[in-house]
Amino acid sequence: MTNPAETARPERQRKPDWIRVKAPTSKGYGETRALMRELGLNTVCEEAACPNIGECWTKKHATVMILGDVCTRACAFCNVKTGMPRAVDPMEPINVATAAAKMGLEHIVITSVDRDDLPDGGAGHFVKVIKALRELTPNTTIEILTPDFRNKMEAAVESIVEAGPDVYNHNLETVPRLYPTIRPGARYYASLRLLEQVKRHDPRIFTKSGVMLGLGEERLEVHQVMDDMRSAQIDFLTMGQYLQPTPKHAKVIEFVTPKAFDAYGSIARAKGFLQVAASPLTRSSYHAGEDFRQMRQAREAQLAKAAQKA
């Protein structure tokens, strides 16, 4: 007879107090949710079960997820549905721009699912969204968070860079050693090359990348990722705690303390990043508008200092 203790599903680690957030209830949260529903837009805030959704939506900040809500990849950390996606919505670019205008956004973050089924990986749709935003709400700064455009990267990145986003984000997610289990459909060095290519095409565009901690990475491996990012001229590093969305996803190996995040942040700044966000609740688009303004100021100060020395 089987022992029930042997077949019971292992318990997930209990979240420490520093990772807990209040359930969203504010008026602003409700208004943001209603507008997304009205325009038929998906958000990564909901699809990825982001812990900051209450705070961000209360402030009417949202990260719009284009190209549908079904991904062609199955990463071990991600809560977005996997399968065969539906056809691309031709009205999505104008709907995204309409949402940005109605919310009065100074800064918008656009991300997407992976669309390996599309000939260009969805790059053309990113371009249409950027153009619609520039036309309808020209004062809104635009940050994009793209997939890796596997086997289509060069043409995809070139077309998006030509559309002129203000920030190009692509997350490395974790250290190279963990890619086979955590991000099996991607390649670490291909993601680095993507970000290098953005800078080659247009050095004025800010580049950004992020990693999750708590998946079993070693401290020196994280330092090496920072060095790799700086070699690729990445301007902005985000670091946050990985949280297991469901029991089917990769387990949390460690809850990294706020003090440890502070230490990583200090090291990253010493390595030369223009901007660093490192805390348990940091996510790619968390406080993105405020961080963008600080990063732009840091670059201006850097250029002014260089001009004085010349």
UniProtKB/Swiss-Prot annotation:
Binding site for [4Fe-4S] cluster 2: 71, 75, 78
InterPro entries noted in UniProt: Aldolase_TIM (IPR013785), Elp3/MiaA/NifB-like_rSAM (IPR006638), LIAS_N (IPR031691), Lipoyl_synth (IPR003698), rSAM (IPR007197)
Catalytic reaction(s) noted: [[Fe-S] cluster scaffold protein carrying a second [4Fe-4S](2+) cluster] + N(6)-octanoyl-L-lysyl-[protein] + 2 oxidized [2Fe-2S]-[ferredoxin] + 2 S-adenosyl-L-methionine + 4 H(+) = [[Fe-S] cluster scaffold protein] + N(6)-[(R)-dihydrolipoyl]-L-lysyl-[protein] + 4 Fe(3+) + 2 hydrogen sulfide + 2 5'-deoxyadenosine + 2 L-methionine + 2 reduced [2Fe-2S]-[ferredoxin]
Signal sequence coordinates: none
Enzyme class: transferase
Cofactor: [4Fe-4S] cluster
Pathway stated in the Swiss-Prot or TrEMBL entry: Protein modification; protein lipoylation via endogenous pathway; protein N(6)-(lipoyl)lysine from octanoyl-[acyl-carrier-protein]: step 2/2
GO molecular function: 4 iron, 4 sulfur cluster binding; lipoate synthase activity; metal ion binding
Residues covered by the Radical SAM core domain: 57-274
Main subcellular localisation: cytoplasm
One GO term describing the cellular component: cytoplasm
Stored NCBIfam families: lipA, PRK05481.1, PRK12928.1
Family according to the record: Belongs to the radical SAM superfamily. Lipoyl synthase family.
HAMAP family xrefs: Lipoyl_synth
Name by which UniProt lists this protein: Lipoyl synthase
